[in-house]
Structures are given as C-alpha cells and as structure tokens.
C-alpha cells in the first residue's frame, strides 16, 4: 500500500551500526514504520538471519507484508512493541534475540496525512490513533473526559504551561458543539493560549499530549523496555531513538538504573555478594544526535536522541 506520504528514516546508518548486526542473528524492529531500518538490517543479514517487525499502524503493516513477501527472512506482526515479550515467547525467541531497535513517536506519513488526525497543520478527523481500529480516539476522549483529566493530559504529556486554561476552553466549547476536526480543536487551543512560543504553533504541546495519551505511548515504552531486556540474549544490543524529553527521560533512567545494578537503595559495603545487585546492562557511549547534514535534509531529525545498551546477564 502506498499512502502517498513519504518517511525519511532518522539516524538510519547510526542505529543499524549500533546493533552490530551478525549475519546469522535474530533481530526485532519494534517500530517498523515504512521499513527504513528493517531494510538496512536485512541487507546485512545472511541466509540464516531473521528479522521480526512490529507496528500498530495498518499502512505500516501493509508495507511490511509486501516486504515479507519478497524476503522470507522477515516477518511482521500488528502489535505494539510493548507486547514483544509475549511475541518472543510464542516464537521461542525469549533470551535469544541478538538486537532490538525502537524508533519512537509518530512517523511522517501519520503526521502528514490529514485523515489520520495527528496534525494541527492540516484539517482532518480528530483521531490520532496509530491503530484506528482500537482504543478511544482523540475526539472521543475530548468529548467525555472531565476538564481536570484533559488538563492533566495537556500538562503531563504535552508539558503545556496553560493546560488548565486550555482544558477549560475545550470543555466550554464542547458543550455547545462537539469537536470532530483537528483544525477546530487547534483554533480553540490557539485562542486559549495566552503566550505563544516563537516559531511554534500554540496547539503543539496540547496535541502532543493528546497523541501520547490516546496511544499510551509512555506506558508502552516502559513495558517495551522491560520486555526487550528479557528477550535479548547476553551480548544483545538495545537501540532506542526518542524524539522528546518525556520519552528520552524514561529511556535514560531505565538504562542508568540497570547499568548501575539494583543496589542503589541498599546500604553500601554490605558484606554480601548477590547477583541481582550486579549491573544487567552496559551503556555504550553517550547519547547520539543527528548530524548537521541530516538535520538540514530532514528537520524532523533535530529532536532525535539515540541511546544504546548491551545486555550483560
């Protein structure tokens, strides 16, 4: 399926290089998207290598199925990467995966297609679901949630300073007419925001908060990181690309905690040696960002942060 909207894969070479792909390895692409990372991984796998892709988006699944028809080493499943643990168990891969890649957030085709309802830039139905067949849409949430809950979503997930004021404006307006279109909601948020940031649409943060809530993005990330650690073999690599501070904070803290071991809250110099207190992962290098060349070619890569870890036990 060709949606007509293109996607430029961020940190393509860097992410796949960080995986240290082995020709006979088994790899998981937790966020297939349009397959940029997956295709490069496949190009480095030998005949015995395997790649399993995950995505919730129906258009991504269609693209993945076409790739699977061309290459028998690749399989794609329509599941969140939060469920990669159970998928690995079902396929007998638990503790046997050589590397896992998570490229977080929303893809360019999702943002650019007005019918998906992710963007305030182009009017479309107020949906925002990565899988439009499951869960509650943004319109349904906005129509039923109390002002306090809407404000929490704007503030907690969108880091919006004027969350309460904007939520009250949304509730006041929905009592007159329900929200069905992205442009309609964006206009109400724009009017309710008293301090516009230079170069940024005043609805940006609220829309981010809604999208994260509707898709349970942070909850999925936390579950996916834990599942990834269990699925990896010793020496396996976990590569995560995030696009905003909330995601990156979760990834950074997860990796730091496991790299230090689990004895952070225990008294020092205890006369015991206990395996669970030893580090579970090794962090490789510092956070990596897109190059100047990449950010000029693809401005959406400016906020990308990549972190890499290796499983020790």
Swiss-Prot record:
Q: InterPro entries annotated for this entry?
A: RsmH, SAM-dep_MeTrfase_MraW_recog, SAM-dependent_MTases_sf
Where does the protein principally reside? cytoplasm
Per its UniProt record, what Gene3D superfamilies does this chain match? Putative methyltransferase TM0872, insert domain (1.10.150.170), Vaccinia Virus protein VP39 (3.40.50.150)
What reactions does this protein catalyze?
Answer: cytidine(1402) in 16S rRNA + S-adenosyl-L-methionine = N(4)-methylcytidine(1402) in 16S rRNA + S-adenosyl-L-homocysteine + H(+)
GO BP terms: rRNA base methylation
Q: Name one GO cellular component term.
A: cytoplasm
| A GO MF term | rRNA (cytosine-N4-)-methyltransferase activity
Task: Report the subcellular localization.
Answer: Cytoplasm
Show the stretches that span the lipid bilayer. none
Q: Which domain of life is it from?
A: Bacteria
- A Pfam match is Methyltransf_5
What SUPFAM superfamilies does this protein map onto? Putative methyltransferase TM0872, insert domain, S-adenosyl-L-methionine-dependent methyltransferases
**EC annotation?**
2.1.1.199
Which residues make up the binding site for S-adenosyl-L-methionine? 35-37, 55, 81, 103, 110
Q: Which keywords does the record carry?
A: Cytoplasm, Methyltransferase, rRNA processing, S-adenosyl-L-methionine, Transferase
Q: Which NCBIfam families does the record associate with it? A: 16S rRNA (cytosine(1402)-N(4))-methyltransferase RsmH
Role according to the record: Specifically methylates the N4 position of cytidine in position 1402 (C1402) of 16S rRNA.
Which family does the similarity line name?
Belongs to the methyltransferase superfamily. RsmH family.
Indicate what this protein is called per its UniProt record: Ribosomal RNA small subunit methyltransferase H
In its UniProt entry, the species of origin is given as Pseudomonas savastanoi pv. phaseolicola (strain 1448A / Race 6)
Gene name tied to this protein: rsmH
